């Protein structure tokens, strides 16, 4: 009867295996249910949207760095203005001044205005120098014109004398 008992034991083992198998299937069914929740993961996708919000905050920090670069551009614009001070063309200075005025903070504009008045004084001096130069040049041209017609008159008077 021992073999029968062994078969009965194997039968009970098989029954136990069958009992365990449905439990695994139930777990498998639970695994299939979370897949629709993964499909519902729009709620989970909203959490990465919150992560996307944090890089926007990082962008605002980058804007703070941009203000630092704007200060550097103002200093560069001032350097170009000083470098152009030796140039005769004033049109090259004006765009740099306007760019500097736009970039400077309103508190700094008050400090920048006296500098602009000093530069206007320099412009007035240059225009005065140009006017004096213009006054001298026409005087020289008039003197030359007066001498040339006198020579032409002398030649004309001599030529008809030869023809006669």
Swiss-Prot record:
GO cellular component annotations of the record: chromosome; nucleus
Molecular function, one GO term: DNA binding
Keyword flag Nucleus: yes
Region (Disordered), start-end ranges: 1-164
Post-translational modification: Cell-growth/division-associated phosphorylation by a CDC2-like kinase.
UniProt biased composition (Basic residues): 16-27
Protein's UniProt keywords contain Cell inner membrane: no
Protein origin, superkingdom: Eukaryota
Compartment(s): Nucleus; Chromosome
Residue stretches of biased makeup (Polar residues): 1-10
Keywords: Chromosome, DNA-binding, Nucleus, Phosphoprotein
Sites bearing Phosphothreonine, chain numbering: 47, 54
Role played: Histones H1 are necessary for the condensation of nucleosome chains into higher-order structures.
Protein name (database record): Histone H1
Gene name, Swiss-Prot/TrEMBL: HHO
């Amino acid at each position: 009867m021992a073999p029968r008992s062994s078969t009965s034991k194997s039968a009970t083992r098989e029954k136990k295996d069958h009992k365990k198998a449905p439990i695994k299937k139930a777990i498998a069914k639970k695994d299939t249910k979370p897949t629709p929740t993964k499909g519902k993961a729009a709620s989970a996708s909203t959490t990465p949207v919150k992560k996307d919000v944090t890089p926007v905050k990082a962008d605002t920090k980058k804007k703070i760095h941009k203000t630092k670069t704007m200060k550097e551009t103002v200093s560069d614009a001032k350097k170009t203005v000083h470098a152009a001070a030796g140039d005769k063309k004033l049109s090259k200075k004006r765009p740099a001044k306007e760019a500097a005025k736009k970039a400077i903070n309103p508190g700094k504009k008050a400090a920048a205005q006296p500098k602009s008045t000093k530069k206007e004084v320099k412009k007035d001096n240059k225009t005065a120098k140009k006017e004096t130069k213009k006054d001298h040049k026409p005087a020289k041209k008039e003197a030359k014109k007066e001498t040339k017609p006198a020579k032409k008159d002398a030649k004309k008077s001599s030529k008809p004398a030869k023809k006669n």
